[in-house]
Amino acid sequence: MGDEEKRNRAITARRQHLKSVMLQIAATELEKEESRREAEKQNYLAEHCPPLHIPGSMSEVQELCKQLHAKIDAAEEEKYDMEVRVQKTSKELEDMNQKLFDLRGKFKRPPLRRVRMSADAMLKALLGSKHKVCMDLRANLKQVKKEDTEKERDLRDVGDWRKNIEEKSGMEGRKKMFESES
C-alpha cells in the first residue's frame, strides 16, 4: 500500500502542477487579449475621431461648441425620422400580415376578453384605423305604430282573470259573491 499511496500522491501533485500551468497560460492569454482590445480601440478612435483642435480664444471655443451642438441636433433629427419610419413600416407590416391571414383563412386568435363596444368601434378595430365606416344599426329598422287591436284587448282581459280569482278568494270574496247574487 505504501507504493500505491506514493503513486497516488505523485499523480495528484502532477495534476495540481498541470492545473497551475494551465491557469498561468490562461492568465497571460487574457492579458494579451485585453491589450489587443485596447490597441484596437485606440486605432478605431484615431481613425474615426479627428483630433480636437482647441483654439486659443473663448469666442472660438464657443463657436466650436455651437458647431458641435448643430451636428448633434442634426443627428438627433435624423434618428427621430428613422424611428418614425421604422414604426410606420412595422405598423404596415402588421396590417399586411393580418390581411394575409384573413385571405388564407388562418386567423391569429388573440386572447378574448369581454368588451362592451359599439358597432362603429368594432368595425374600426376590425378594418383598421385607415378605414372610416359609420354604421347605424337603427337606421334600417322600420317603425311600427302601436295599435290597440281587439286581440290585444282580449289578451289583456284574459290576464285579468287572475285578479278576479284573487279578489274572490278568502272570506271577503265569498261574501261579495253572495251579495252580488242576491
Curated annotation (Swiss-Prot):
Record-listed N-acetylglycine modification sites: G2
GO process terms (BP): cardiac muscle contraction; positive regulation of DNA-templated transcription; skeletal muscle contraction
Gene encoding the protein: TNNI2
Organism: Homo sapiens
Annotated keywords: Acetylation, Actin-binding, Disease variant, Muscle protein, Phosphoprotein
Modified residues (Phosphoserine): S118
Protein name listed in UniProt: Troponin I, fast skeletal muscle
Residues with the Phosphothreonine modification: T12
Residue numbers spanned by region Involved in binding TNC and actin: 97-117
Signal peptide as annotated in the record: none
Gene3D superfamilies associated with the record: 1.20.5.350, 6.10.250.180
Disease: Arthrogryposis, distal, 2B1: A form of distal arthrogryposis, a disease characterized by congenital joint contractures that mainly involve two or more distal parts of the limbs, in the absence of a primary neurological or muscle disease. DA2B is characterized by contractures of the hands and feet, and a distinctive face characterized by prominent nasolabial folds, small mouth and downslanting palpebral fissures. DA2B1 inheritance is autosomal dominant.
